[in-house]
Regions:
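Extended alpha-helical interaction segments
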Residues: 10-77
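Short, cationic/aromatic linear interface patches
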Residues: 104-153
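Signature of dsDNA virion morphogenesis modules
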Residues: 6, 17-23, 116, 126
Length: 182
């Protein structure tokens, strides 16, 4: 990535710390209240964050979401730092295309129990398989938004055609005149 685009990204999202503050776990609720915007908005993807900030900073941001989840779930057995770090790296690498807003939405849905529950232990495998389910949900949502957009475009075209077209009875009148003049 070019130096100019790096500068732009940093201006837009600030340094790693201000990005982390802006996209903190409390924003999960906002993402859940604005599902369409979470998917279609212009929040940066994990890949873009990786181009803009050192990997450690991106991992730290994901770890903050995970720690928030552990705190929410009230887990008895706290995971080791190594486990949390490894999980954050797996999420960053495997789901590089997810936007920050989508990941926040995922953690919100995870907390609501939509992808199963945690019994005293937050199993990394449960989180990874929940991400697979979320990926399918994301695909359905994006397809739905795409269909809705195509429908809007079609309606616009029809409205435009209607404005530019001659009403049907006038066509018949015109045709009648042509027929009579022959």
């Amino acid at each position: 990535s070019s130096a100019a685009s790096d500068v732009y990204k940093r201006q837009r999202y600030g340094d790693g710390e201000s990005f982390a503050k802006k996209f903190n776990p409390s924003l999960q609720v906002v993402c859940a209240q604005n599902v369409e915007r979470s998917f279609k908005g212009n929040a940066p993807s994990l890949a873009l964050l990786g181009e803009t900030y050192p990997d450690e900073q991106v991992n730290t941001w994901i770890i903050a979401q995970l720690m928030d989840l552990y705190k929410f779930a009230g887990v008895k057995e706290k995971p080791t730092f190594q486990q949390v770090l490894e999980l954050s790296v797996m999420i960053r690498v495997e789901y590089y295309y997810l936007k920050a807003s989508e990941l926040l939405l995922f953690f919100f849905k995870l907390k609501t129990g939509e992808y199963g529950t945690f019994y005293g232990v937050v199993d990394p495998m449960v989180i990874m398989s929940a991400l697979i389910e979320f990926k399918a949900y994301r695909k359905r949502q994006l397809e739905k938004y795409d269909r809705e957009e195509q429908e809007r475009q079609r309606e616009k075209r029809y409205e435009k055609q209607d404005k530019n077209s001659v009403p049907f009875p006038d066509h018949l009148e015109f045709l009648k005149k042509i027929m009579e003049s022959e």
